[in-house]
């Protein structure tokens, strides 16, 4: 099955998303921040990266830029509570940096799983 990396500093949300994806037989790697994500990222294993945008250490925008360099074909999903309002919103910046999809918090895990499925089809 395809590999998915979840980069999220909220431990409860990270585990909720992991469970939802593993139930659909995805291989899941998790990281609590951008620095950990970049240390764990393996292009041969990870097909989709789901990253929160506001995190300590390396933020999600940096993760998007670096993953795009390491594996241009990776699908990138940005998640944030910042929403899409305004020209300076984090989700809008993520789109401009190459995120394939953006999802505003709160969302249902099933919505995210569906987006992963769509991006991989």
Model-derived features with residue positions:
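Conserved acidic carboxylate
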Residues: 8
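Active-site residues of response regulator receiver
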Residues: 52
């Amino acid at each position: 099955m395809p590999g998915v990396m979840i980069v999220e500093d909220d431990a409860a949300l990270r585990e909720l998303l992991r469970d939802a994806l593993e139930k659909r037989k995805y291989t899941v790697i998790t990281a609590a921040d951008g620095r950990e994500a970049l240390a764990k990222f393996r292009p041969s294993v990870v097909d989709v990266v789901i990253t929160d945008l506001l995190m300590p250490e390396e933020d999600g925008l940096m993760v998007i830029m670096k993953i795009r360099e390491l594996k241009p074909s990776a699908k990138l999903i940005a998640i944030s509570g910042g929403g899409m309002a305004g020209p300076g919103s984090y989700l809008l910046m993520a789109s401009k940096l190459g995120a394939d999809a953006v999802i505003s918090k709160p969302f249902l895990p099933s919505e995210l799983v569906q987006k992963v499925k769509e991006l991989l089809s």
